[in-house]
Amino acid sequence: LSRYQGLIYRKKRVGLLFDLNKMSNELSKAIQQLKKRQTVNGSWPWFEGMPDDRYITQYIVTGFGHLDHLKIKNIRENGEVMEMVQRAIQYLDNRIQEDYEWQLKHNKSKLNNNQLGALQIQYLYARSYFKDVLLAEKNKTAFDYYLKQAEKYWLPNSRYLQGMIALTLNRYDKTAKAVAIMKSLKENSITSEEMGMYWKENYERYFWQEAPIESQALLIEAFDEVANDTKSVDALKVWLLRSKQTQNWQTTKA
C-alpha cells in the first residue's frame, strides 16, 4: 500500500511540475505578445492596430503587479518586463495629470467635491504595486489629489472599487482609513454556512467595476492584506468556489 501511495504521490508531483512548466511557457509567450503590442507611448490597445486604451493598460500593469506580489514572477529582476511596466506607468502618470488639468480648467471651484472615477481608482491601485517606480515631479500634485479624493470619497463606489481603495491606502501608509473601509465592507456583507461570505450586489452587471467574481477575488486580497482576517478570507473563498460550481464565469479575468 505504501509503495502504491508513493507511486501516486510521484505521479502527482510530475503532473504539478508539468503544470508549472506549462504555466511558465504560457507566461513567457504572453510577455512576448505584450512586448510586441505595446505602443510607442507605453500604452496597450485592446487589439493590435487599435488606439491606446487606458483601462487595458492599467489592467495589464495590475496583472504584472499581481504576478510579482504573489511571487509567481519576479518582475523587478526581469529587465525586459520591468522596462515595459515603467513605460506603461509613465503613460498612466501622464494620463492622471491630464485628468487633474481638466479639473483645474473646467471644475476649479469644485476641486474639493467628489471628482473620483473608476479609472482614477484603478490607476491608484495599479500604481500601488510599483511605488518604487519614480513618479515625476510634474505628476505629484495630480497623484496626491486623487489619492486624497480616494481617502475622502471611497463610500459611493462599488465593493470592488472600495477594496481597491483600501489596498491602495494601506500601501501608502494611510492605514486607519484602509482599516475603516474593511470594517464597513465586513459589516455590509452576508455570511451563511452554505454560501460563505459575500455581498448582495454579487450578481453580473454591465460595468467592469461591478463584476462579481473579480470583486470577490479582489476582496479576498483586501481582507488578507489589509485586515489580516483569515476567517473572512476563508469564507470569501467558499462563495467563490460555490459560484464556480453553479455557473460559468462570465469574463476572461474571472
Predicted regions and their residues:
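Large, well-folded core regions of big proteins
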Residues: 1-254
